[in-house]
A protein has these predicted regions:
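Flexible, glycine-rich linker and terminal segments associated
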Residues: 2-17, 66, 70-252
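Conserved, compact domain cores that house catalytic/ligand-binding motifs in diverse enzymes
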Residues: 12-81
Length: 252
């Protein structure tokens, strides 16, 4: 989940990184990422960013506003250009709205109520890599059209961790499938050791589109435990993360 994007007045953050995008099938294009945020008066933040690979590029521009007791909002637009072959280049835009609010009386946070709408030609970096490397798998869903997500976090006190609940719904271009996700979890820490336990349930409603495509529902439950352990000595602030999960699948 993401918070509405804000910076204090006069503060500027710049982040630049270079690395490889690691696809599960071994596709590893070099990627450059950069972003900048600056806080202005009256609770306004302007921000922008970019991603670039050999055949992919995107640029984003957005604005955030502190609403005081009402919370905070931000809105941004991303333009992307994705090349798949000499005569197949897609361009499109994505529009995102974020809202966050903290309720001090109950120590509850509404971390995100966001809506993202993408035009048909818009591809994220991961979607571009997936289509280039595994087109048959990619076209089982295609690129994402819209997503709505909300996360509610309840603090149990300084020493007792947090409970959280996330709900989301998303749809894709070129299919009428609807994916829904519910995740409930608990996270806590002790000194530099942290852990998270979660249960998630996802459901995909597939709509039939002709004689060879039957409507069905596929659901999946995932139980996960993750543990983050600090590495002492010369490793400085490095951490080792361990996780274990169990999947239960069903279809109808």
């Amino acid at each position: 989940a993401s918070l509405a994007i804000l910076k204090r007045e006069g503060q500027t953050d710049v982040d630049v990184s270079v690395g490889e995008l690691r696809d599960e099938d071994g596709f590893t294009p070099d990627v450059l990422q950069a972003q900048i945020l600056h806080g202005f008066s009256h609770g306004i933040t302007l921000y922008g960013g970019m991603q670039a690979a050999e055949n992919y590029g995107s640029a984003a521009l957005g604005v955030g506003k502190d609403l005081g007791a009402l919370g905070a909002i931000s809105f941004d637009v991303t333009h992307a250009r994705a090349n798949f072959s000499h005569d197949d280049t897609e361009t499109g835009q994505s529009y995102r709205f974020l809202y966050s609010k903290r309720f001090d009386d109950t120590d509850t946070s509404l971390r995100l109520v966001g809506y993202r709408y993408s035009t048909e030609g818009y591809y994220t970096l991961n979607e571009w890599a997936s289509r280039r490397n595994s087109p048959e798998d990619f076209w089982e869903t295609g690129n994402r059209r819209s997503r709505v997500e909300g996360t509610l976090t309840q603090s149990l006190g300084r020493d007792y961790g947090n409970l959280y609940l996330t709900l989301s719904r998303q749809q894709y271009w070129h299919t009428d499938d609807v994916e829904r996700l519910m995740q409930f979890g608990y996270s806590s820490s002790w000194k530099r050791l942290s852990w998270n336990v979660s249960w998630s349930y996802s459901n995909t409603a597939r709509q039939g589109t002709g004689n060879n495509h039957a409507s069905d529902n596929t659901s999946e439950q995932i139980y996960m435990l993750s543990l983050s352990v600090p590495l002492s000595g010369w490793w400085g602030n490095s951490y080792a993360t361990y996780s274990v999960s169990q999947n239960d699948n069903s279809g109808s």
